[in-house]
Amino acid sequence: MSDNSKTRVVVGMSGGVDSSVTALLLKEQGYDVIGIFMKNWDDTDENGVCTATEDYKDVVAVADQIGIPYYSVNFEKEYWDRVFEYXXAEYRAGRTPNPDVMCNKEIKFKAFLDYAMTLGADYVATGHYARVARDEDGTVHMLRGVDNGKDQTYFLSQLSQEQLQKTMFPLGHLEKPEVRKLAEEAGLSTAKKKDSTGICFIGEKNFKNFLSNYLPAQPGRMMTVDGRDMGEHAGLMYYTIGQRGGLGIGGQHGGDNAPWFVVGKDLSKNILYVGQGFYHDSLMSTSLEASQVHFTREMPEEFTLECTAKFRYRQPDSKVTVHVKGDKAEVIFAEPQRAITPGQAVVFYDGEECLGGGLIDNAYRDGQVCQYI
């Protein structure tokens, strides 16, 4: 049996149950474990309590319980520059960004990884639900987490081979209830702490209120595709393609009580397009264009790939054909897809393996660009 005590693993600890159990398992496996709390956002909740302070207390309690050293490191500047500014620019451009994808790429597996290396780390570990498999030649494959409902490879799809080679995901083979059970059996103080939800820098706060602090809203007209005026929208950045709630129009227009959905945007005219029906024609597309396309393993500059893809988190895989050229790709769907949203990630899979992904620029319906931005 290999001597793990000579291998130093630096664990990103958030104060949640997943990262707590990650540290616990590595410690039990004999690794030299250090816990790091990342402070990425200067945050107070509606009661004036700094949530990061509360989370750090949980990290300290768990680290003391399992007997590992811990540090707190501040990445607020890196986070602002590399994640928040990106997200704000995407919202201004009428797109719907996925800050968690960028946070993993730029903070958790770049700024944090670099910092861990200064502590003499051989690996970093996080509480993500994903797996890594290592070939004899050293190539690392990123595989889906065993818990299908919790699998987080979608958010990890921009990680590079170099980043993955330095990464461990100890929870990848576990299901969430097993993780909670391990925390309870070990008496960890975070065993019953509820999971955090929402965008990493917004947390539980009201999204609309948060965004309006940083980006001035520009109300405009809400219209149907055939030109009927449906009232005013609050600002295009507050709406995403395919969204149902928050339109304030119900079934009052005409006799049809079918629900209304956001079916398009025109940034240049500041118009929000709405339509009735979950599968409204304007919501359906047959292909997309992506940029910032990246693979977790070395691939040719130009190639075609038959695989499956996800266009949003927790969506079932769909069969696609991907034509890759440099960091751009055309993705053709085997079946029409609903609400393909510019700014979101498209992520490619070959069975269990996450191959990588890109950011959606445009959706197309039979060769015609969809009016989504």
From Swiss-Prot:
Listed GO MF terms: ATP binding; tRNA binding; tRNA-uridine 2-sulfurtransferase activity
Binding sites annotated in the UniProt record for ATP: G12, M13, S14, G15, G16, V17, D18, S19, M38, G127
Assigned EC number: 2.8.1.13
Subcellular location: Cytoplasm
Sorted UniProt keywords: ATP-binding, Cytoplasm, Disulfide bond, Nucleotide-binding, RNA-binding, Transferase, tRNA processing, tRNA-binding
Region of interest (Interaction with tRNA), ranges: 150-152, 312-313
GO terms of biological process kind: tRNA wobble position uridine thiolation
UniProt region (Interaction with target base in tRNA), positions on chain: 98-100
Family to which the UniProt record says this protein belongs: Belongs to the MnmA/TRMU family.
Protein name: tRNA-specific 2-thiouridylase MnmA
